[in-house]
């Protein structure tokens, strides 16, 4: 229903609406949704891609990235995310950040250079970069 025009629109058969919202404490200037509004949605928790899926996505998006480099970067992402889940780190690593890092691989940077200059710079709280660096060295 459009309040301004007074026109009611009916949705077509088999039409569904999907919404995404970054409403948690980790997002700047976000607020909790009104409970009545939030109740209108079914919540779905999405997991990160598996390392194999994430490596495949990197190679699909950036065809010049070698499979071994994509696999290494995906494993590093898995370790850093796992550390965030265990509260050893306060910041996770998004798929977007991993893809951004993979773009540098395609430009000829090594995995180590990308990790040092792109990934580890996400960890700015005292001591977190050391924790992240120690995890990355395991790969």
Set out the residue ranges of the language-model regions:
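C-terminal regulatory/interaction module of P-loop NTP-utilizing enzymes
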Residues: 1-139
């Amino acid at each position: 229903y459009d309040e301004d025009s007074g026109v009611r629109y009916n949705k077509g058969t088999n039409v569904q609406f999907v919404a995404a919202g970054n409403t948690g404490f980790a997002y700047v200037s976000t607020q909790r949704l009104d409970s009545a509004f939030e109740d209108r949605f079914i919540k779905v928790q999405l997991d990160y891609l598996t390392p194999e899926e994430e490596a495949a996505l990197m190679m699909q998006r950036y065809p010049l990235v070698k499979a071994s480099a994509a696999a290494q970067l995906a494993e590093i992402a898995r370790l850093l995310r796992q550390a965030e889940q265990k509260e050893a780190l306060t910041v996770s690593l998004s798929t977007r950040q991993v893809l951004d890092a993979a773009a540098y691989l395609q430009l000829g940077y090594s995995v180590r250079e990308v990790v040092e200059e792109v990934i580890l710079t996400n960890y700015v709280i005292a001591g977190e970069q050391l924790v992240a660096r120690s995890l990355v060295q395991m790969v």
